[in-house]
UniProtKB/Swiss-Prot annotation:
Family: Belongs to the LTI78/LTI65 family.
Name of the protein: Low-temperature-induced 65 kDa protein
Modified residues (Phosphoserine): S536
Keywords linked to the UniProt accession: Phosphoprotein, Repeat
BP GO annotations: abscisic acid-activated signaling pathway; leaf senescence; response to abscisic acid; response to cold; response to salt stress; response to water deprivation
Pfam families per UniProt: CAP160 (PF07918), LTI65_LTI78_N (PF23403), LTI65_LTI78_NYQTKV (PF23402), LTI65_PGEED (PF23399)
Leader sequence segment: none
Compositionally biased spans, kind Acidic residues: 62-73
Region (Disordered): 1-383, 408-429, 461-485, 537-619
Species of provenance: Arabidopsis thaliana
UniProt-annotated stretches for the region 5 X 5 AA repeats of [IV]-[AMS]-[EST]-K-L: 404-511
Length: 619
C-alpha cells in the first residue's frame, strides 16, 4: 500500500493543482482560499503519511502542528492565503501546483510575493518536513520524484528570477527545522552540502543551472547533481579547477626543469648545504685536499661537471641540480665542498659514503693520539699526573713482567718463592704469581728506600685523597722514584682482576669501617697456619735473609720497628707481640699474594708492610 501511495503521488498532484486553480480564481476571496487550504492540507497529510511510513514517522506530529499554524496564518494575512497553499504545493514535493500556478501568470506574481512574509512562520515549519520525505523518495525511489522537480523548475524559473529575495527565505525556512545553522548556508543554496544529510542535501544544494540557482535549483538538482558531484569529490584530489593545479604540481615533481619546480626544493637544499658547509667548512676544506686524490672523488667531480652541463635536464637528481646551483657561488672552494655534500646525500653510493665516513675516523685517531700526547706531556693536577703515570705504566707492564720473571728465575729469590708456594697453593695460580713478583721486587727495590718512600707517601697521602688508602699513592710515588720496573709492578697492582677486586673490597671494608680487629685476628690465624705449614728451617732461613737485606738497607731492628709502626697504624690496632709482628709480614705477604696488589687495601699491605714481610720471609 505504501508503494502504491507513493506512485499515484503524481496523480494526486495532478488533482491538487486543479483544486488550486479554483483558489487562483477565488484568490481575492479569503473564505474560498481557506477551504482550498484545508483540502490541500488533507492531501498533503496523506502524502506525508505515505512518505513518512518509510522511515519518517516522527514528522507526523510536527506536520500537524504546522498545519494548525497554516490554518491560522491565512486568516491573519488575508490575501496571501492562497499563496501559502501554492507555495506549500511547490515545496512539499507537489511541484505541479507551482507549475499550474505558473500557468496563471498574474496569480503567480501575487502568489510568490506575500510568501516572503508568511514563509518564515509558516513554511519554515510546515514545508520543510514534506521536503525531507520527498527528497528521500527522490533518492531512494528515484525516477518518479525526479520528474516532478523538473516540472517545478520549468515553471518556477522566471518566478525565481523575479522574486529571488522572497524565495531565499523559502529555502531558508525549508531547512530551518533541520538546523538553525543550515538557514544561513541555505540562502546561497550551494554551501550546505556538509550541513545537510548526504542523500537529500547533496542532491539539492548543488543547483547547476544558472536560472535554477534559487528556488527551482533545489528541485532540479535531483537531475543534474551528478555533474557537480563529479567535480566535488575531485575537489581535494583534483576537480576541474583543482586538476589543473594538481597536474601542474605533478609536472613540477616529475619535471624539475620547470621554474616553479625548481623554486621550492632546491632552495631548501641550498640552505641545508650551506648549513653543512658552515658547520664543517674548516674540516671539509682541509679534507677536500685529501679527497681529491682518491678515484672516488674524481668520479664525483666528473659528476659535478655533468651536473654543470645537464643542470636543467629532468633526469637529474635534486642533489645534482643542487650542485649545479651551488656552483654559482663565487668561492670555488666552498662550491666544491657543497657539491661534494650535495652529491653524497642524494646519490648515496657506497663509494661516496665510505670515504667520507672512514677518513674522518683516521683524522680523528691522529687527533686523539695528539690529544693523548698533549695530556701526557701537560698534566695539570696531581691526580692527572698520577693518572697519566699509571696509563704509561700500564703500557709498559707486560715488558716489566718479563723483566721480573727473568729476575726471579735467575736470582736466589726463587727459593724463597718456592718455600712460600705450598702456602699459596690454596690461592689461585695468578695470585701466587703476583705474590712471587711482589716478593722479588720489594726485596730488591723497596728496602733501601723505605724511609724516603714513607715520608713522601705521607705527604702525598695528605695531598691526594684517592679511593683507597694512601699506600696506593705511596706505591705510585715509589714507582716513580724507583724506576720503570717498580712503576710497572705498581701499575699491575693497580689493575686487579675480578677475584682481586672482591678480596680488596672486603679488606678495605674491614680496614676502613672499623674491621681492624677482625683483620688482625685473620692475620694471626693465617700466621699460625703458615707457621704450621712452613718448616721452621725455612722460616729461620727467611728471617736470616730478611735481616741480612735489612742490614744492607738501614739496619734490621730499626726496619722491623718501622714495619711494626706502619702495620699497626694502617691496621688501626694495638701493637702485636714480637712473634706476631715478625710473622705478620709473612702472613701479609701471603694475603698480598691472594690480593695480588689489586686495590688500595692490597697495595697498602704489599707496598710497604707486606713488602717488608715478603722480604723477611721470601728471601
Amino acid at each position: 500500500m505504501e508503494s502504491q501511495l507513493t506512485r499515484p503521488y503524481g496523480h494526486e498532484q495532478a488533482e491538487e493543482p486543479i483544486r488550486i486553480h479554483h483558489p487562483e480564481e477565488e484568490e481575492h476571496h479569503e473564505k474560498g482560499a481557506s477551504k482550498v487550504l484545508k483540502k490541500v492540507k488533507e492531501k498533503a497529510k496523506k502524502i506525508k503519511n505515505s512518505l513518512t511510513k518509510h522511515g519518517n514517522g516522527h514528522d507526523h506530529d510536527v506536520e500537524d502542528d504546522d498545519d494548525e499554524y497554516d490554518e491560522q496564518d491565512p486568516e491573519v494575512h488575508g490575501a496571501p492565503v492562497y499563496e501559502s497553499s501554492a507555495v506549500r504545493g511547490g515545496v512539499t514535493g507537489k511541484p505541479k501546483s507551482l507549475s499550474h500556478a505558473g500557468e496563471t501568470n498574474v496569480p503567480a506574481s501575487e502568489e510568490i510575493v506575500p510568501p516572503g512574509t508568511k514563509v518564515f512562520p509558516v513554511v519554515s515549519s510546515d514545508h520543510t518536513k514534506p521536503i525531507e520525505p520527498v527528497s528521500l523518495q527522490d533518492t531512494s525511489y528515484g525516477h518518479e520524484a525526479l520528474a516532478d522537480p523538473v516540472r517545478t523548475t520549468e515553471t518556477s524559473d522566471w518566478e525565481a528570477k523575479r522574486e529571488a529575495p522572497t524565495h531565499y527565505p523559502l529555502g531558508v525556512s525549508e531547512f530551518s527545522d533541520r538546523g538553525e545553522s543550515r538557514e544561513a548556508h541555505q540562502e546561497p543554496l550551494n554551501t550546505p552540502v556538509s550541513l545537510l544529510s548526504a542523500t537529500e542535501d547533496v542532491t539539492r544544494t548543488f543547483a547547476p543551472g544558472g536560472e535554477d540557482d534559487y528556488l527551482g535549483g533545489q528541485r532540479k538538482v535531483n537531475v543534474e547533481t551528478p555533474k557537480r558531484l563529479e567535480e566535488d569529490p575531485a575537489a581535494p584530489g583534483g576537480g576541474s579547477d583543482y586538476l589543473s593545479g594538481v597536474s601542474n604540481y605533478q609536472s613540477k615533481v616529475t619535471d624539475p626543469t620547470h621554474k616553479g619546480g625548481e623554486a621550492g626544493v632546491p632552495e631548501i637544499a641550498e640552505s641545508l648545504g650551506r648549513m653543512k658547509v658552515t658547520d664543517e667548512s674548516p674540516d671539509q676544506k682541509s679534507r677536500q685536499g685529501r679527497e681529491e686524490d682518491f678515484p672516488t672523488r674524481s668520479h664525483e667531480f666528473d659528476l659535478k661537471k655533468e651536473s654543470d652541463i645537464n643542470k636543467n635536464s629532468p633526469a637529474r637528481f635534486g642533489g645534482e641540480s643542487k650542485a649545479g646551483m651551488e656552483e654559482d657561488f663565487p668561492t670555488r672552494g666552498d662550491v666544491k665542498v657543497e657539491s661534494g655534500l650535495g652529491r653524497d646525500l642524494p646519490t648515496g653510493t657506497h663509494d661516496q659514503f665510505s670515504p667520507e665516513l672512514s677518513r674522518p675516523k683516521e683524522r680523528d685517531d691522529s687527533e686523539e693520539t695528539k690529544d693523548e700526547s698533549t695530556h701526557e706531556t701537560k698534566p695539570s693536577t696531581y691526580t692527572e699526573q698520577l693518572a697519566s703515570a699509571t696509563s704509561a705504566i700500564t703500557n709498559k707492564a707486560i715488558a716489566a713482567k718479563n723483566v721480573v720473571a727473568s729476575k726471579l728465575g735467575y736470582t736466589g729469590e726463587n727459593g724463597g718463592g718456592q718455600s712460600e708456594s705450598p702456602v699459596k697453593d690454596e690461592t689461585p695460580r695468578s695470585v701466587t704469581a703476583y705474590g712471587q713478583k711482589v716478593a722479588g721486587t720489594v726485596a730488591e727495590k723497596l728496602t733501601p728506600v723505605y724511609e724516603k718512600v714513607k715520608e713522601t707517601g705521607s705527604t702525598v697521602m695528605t695531598k691526594l685523597p684517592l679511593s683507597g688508602g694512601g699506600s696506593g699513592v705511596k706505591e705510585t710515588q715509589q714507582g716513580e722514584e724507583k724506576g720503570v720496573t717498580a712503576k710497572n709492578y705498581i701499575s699491575e697492582k693497580l689493575k686487579p682482576g675480578e677475584e682481586d677486586k672482591a678480596l680488596s673490597e672486603m679488606i678495605a671494608e674491614k680496614l676502613h669501617f672499623g674491621g681492624g680487629g677482625e683483620k688482625k685476628t685473620t692475620a694471626t690465624k693465617e700466621v699460625e697456619v703458615t707457621v704450621e705449614k712452613i718448616p721452621s728451617d725455612q722460616i729461620a732461613e727467611g728471617k736470616g735473609h730478611g735481616e741480612a737485606v735489612a742490614e744492607e738497607g738501614k739496619g734490621g731492628e730499626g726496619m722491623v720497628g718501622k714495619v711494626k709502626g706502619a702495620v699497626t697504624s694502617w691496621l688501626g690496632g694495638k701493637p702485636k707481640s714480637p712473634r706476631s709482628v715478625e710473622e705478620s709480614p709473612q702472613s701479609l705477604g701471603t694475603t698480598v699474594g691472594t690480593m695480588g696488589f689489586s686495590d688500595s687495601g692490597g697495595s697498602e699491605l704489599g707496598g710497604s708492610g707486606g713488602g717488608k714481610g715478603v722480604q723477611d720471609s721470601g728471601n
